[in-house]
């Protein structure tokens, strides 16, 4: 179907400047070819499909009407930008999307001058576009800044904070509200099309300004009545009153798949003398591809697929994902405790709470893209005696940090944080990596921070959280599947701040936090084979640190390796602080910390990302050998309580 279809018009387009040379009547054909190319490319690489197909015509129209890159297009999130990438000189690399050394799945300033602003997290576009618009105004330039934001992103307060400050930018700021949730049928009739084109035209806007001037000179009572009549009439016609209260001219709704509507409206908006302007564009996710239109949720993000049938490649069978283990254990806990409630921020499927909702619909709260609210809402529930589990991706928990400090930790409220997608995440790259939660959580007084080494440990930790009421507690776990351990049997309530010694050795000790335990054990096998007897501990808790176990290991080994799936400032800092405070390094103890590097790692397969960071068996062995070759000293054997024969430097 698509792979062999010809794309004669698209083949001629290397830049938007060439697109703008096309006859307007040929843009429909270009859009059809662009849709085929987008489907074909995502069929090869996988990625976000539905949202991109929904903005094909809008993307063509924006690059046709606006003088990009001089006029800045600022895309929100970036899931929908594959067609934009194809039209802006990157078609030859579009089948490298989300691959190692390939194109990003989001906009990146380093990738193209047409990517005016990087994106991946939601609801940032209007703020960034306002920055471009104000820079244009300060420079006495007429360059436009166009924010393209979806209706889902408008659930976040940041979008309204930006709009509330946007009036000063005037005509240079344009916001395109891409509404792909509304039914497209009602707003695309002849009357709606006429109204949208009329309202966006210069004569209408000038007439409205004149009438506002007249109203302002009326007696107070008449003026109020006139304004209310105007608001009522415009609200009935276009629904724009809310946005106008924020200082925007409102235009729409416009059929986002009808180029004959889109282009005249965008031209009128581009040439308007006043602003800022919001254009309400109605689109369908998956437009033009039957499988995606029929199952929008399943084609938002896809694996590689057969573009003819729409069938997606299935992942090979394996152990359950950490997310599903968390969800299933939480359901078990909630069946026993009706005080357990859950909160997520527009990610019920990603966090596994869609399953929880099937059992307890009244106890699952999806607050939209509102992490700040989610954290404080959870704090309120905890203060009222409930047991909230606040379930967020690590990368999005960053957005609620002040609330973590002010509303949870200071008040020592027993909010349970399930921090999903902790560590490196593969194809989504740096913007979605869960690199920093360890560092910013262990710094909070009262906070307990756990990380499981496998799926059974995660189930134990969820069970423990359900029974912990002394203050806030968190568990972080990665994207992907477990290691295949059994989940049968009763779950344990873990003693807070206690790790476990997995393997006894004499010379090297590996203190592992999280799912690097398997690699740590592989490294220990290799080190043992080289005559370097190695202990391995599953530390379980970054905070409170198991000081007794840590102290024993530091006193009895020559080389200490800490390993964690987080950035500088996390688990290793806890170990080093204790060692420094107690003088445990004064006699030449060698400690090496393995953690994520102090840079943003690009997209790749997870295992390669961790190997590049040195967080695999090879990296552990290399760190030990390097440490031993620097000022080595002999090792003597001592006896330690509960640990058997352990080596001491």
Curated annotation (Swiss-Prot):
Binding site for Mg(2+): 151, 180
Cofactor(s) listed: Mg(2+); thiamine diphosphate
Record bears the keyword Membrane: no
Record text on cofactor binding: Binds 1 Mg(2+) ion per subunit.
Record GO terms (molecular function): 1-deoxy-D-xylulose-5-phosphate synthase activity; magnesium ion binding; thiamine pyrophosphate binding
Domain of life: Bacteria
Protein name: 1-deoxy-D-xylulose-5-phosphate synthase 1
Quaternary context: Homodimer.
Family: Belongs to the transketolase family. DXPS subfamily.
GO BP annotation list: 1-deoxy-D-xylulose 5-phosphate biosynthetic process; glyceraldehyde-3-phosphate metabolic process; terpenoid biosynthetic process; thiamine biosynthetic process
Entry binding sites for thiamine diphosphate: 79, 120-122, 152-153, 180, 289, 371
Top-rank EC class of the record's enzyme: transferase
Primary role: Catalyzes the acyloin condensation reaction between C atoms 2 and 3 of pyruvate and glyceraldehyde 3-phosphate to yield 1-deoxy-D-xylulose-5-phosphate (DXP).
Catalytic activity: D-glyceraldehyde 3-phosphate + pyruvate + H(+) = 1-deoxy-D-xylulose 5-phosphate + CO2
Organism: Zymomonas mobilis subsp. mobilis (strain ATCC 31821 / ZM4 / CP4)
EC number: 2.2.1.7
Family matches, as InterPro entries: Dxylulose-5-P_synthase, THDP-binding, Transketo_C/PFOR_II, Transketolase-like_Pyr-bd, Transketolase_C, Transketolase_CS
Keywords in alphabetical order: Isoprene biosynthesis, Magnesium, Metal-binding, Thiamine biosynthesis, Thiamine pyrophosphate, Transferase
Keyword Cytoplasm: no
Pathway: Metabolic intermediate biosynthesis; 1-deoxy-D-xylulose 5-phosphate biosynthesis; 1-deoxy-D-xylulose 5-phosphate from D-glyceraldehyde 3-phosphate and pyruvate: step 1/1
